[in-house]
Amino acid sequence: MKIIAKKDLFINDEIRVREVRLVGLDGEQLGIKPLSEAQAIADDANVDLVIIQPQATPPVAKIMNYGKFKFEYQKKRKEQRKKQSVVTVKEVRLSPVIDKGDFETKLRNGRKFLEKGNKVKVSIRFKGRMITHKEIGAKVLAEFAEKTQDIAIIEQRAKMDGRQMFMQLAPIPDKK
């Protein structure tokens, strides 16, 4: 059964058609019935009459407990949202002439991000005449990648973009 938003569902007294194709509690077809008879059947069973396909001719109405239906639908949606994981990209900025202590600090931050399951974009910004020594920047990025290879894979290799060189690391899927 296709789940329809509340605005598309008409329940009990909101239904404004003469006859409906009726579906019972267990999903059995009860045929085309006048609206008054369908509502009487629903009232006898102490449940709701809900139009589930208003565009059909005649509209399809189902006898169901609408409160339970709504609860199950919300529960299913909540479960789907729980299964979704949002992966964010964190950035670690380095310099081509970075000191060893600073490098270790940035490396620690990058590892923390990767352990939390985030992707890490490692970037190096070249200032002034440093741009002529791209190999120094590439060496720094290679060292960063080497020191995180136990928890990350290189998703995008080192690449130049204007005055910036960057690469992207992603956590190894089974080590989140």
Curated annotation (Swiss-Prot):
Compartment(s): Cytoplasm
Name of the protein in its database record: Translation initiation factor IF-3
One GO biological process term: ribosome disassembly
Functional note: IF-3 binds to the 30S ribosomal subunit and shifts the equilibrium between 70S ribosomes and their 50S and 30S subunits in favor of the free subunits, thus enhancing the availability of 30S subunits on which protein synthesis initiation begins.
Highest taxon of source: Bacteria
Keywords: Cytoplasm, Initiation factor, Protein biosynthesis
One Gene Ontology CC term in the entry: membrane
UniProt-listed PANTHER family: TRANSLATION INITIATION FACTOR IF-3, TRANSLATION INITIATION FACTOR IF-3, MITOCHONDRIAL
Gene3D superfamilies named among the record's database cross-references: Translation initiation factor 3 (IF-3), C-terminal domain (3.30.110.10), Translation initiation factor 3 (IF-3), N-terminal domain (3.10.20.80)
Xref: InterPro entries: T_IF-3_C_sf, T_IF-3_N_sf, Translation_initiation_fac3_CS, Translation_initiation_fac_3, Translation_initiation_fac_3_C, Translation_initiation_fac_3_N
Family, as annotated: Belongs to the IF-3 family.
Oligomer and partners: Monomer.
GO molecular function: ribosome binding; translation initiation factor activity
Organism expressing this protein natively: Streptococcus thermophilus (strain ATCC BAA-250 / LMG 18311)
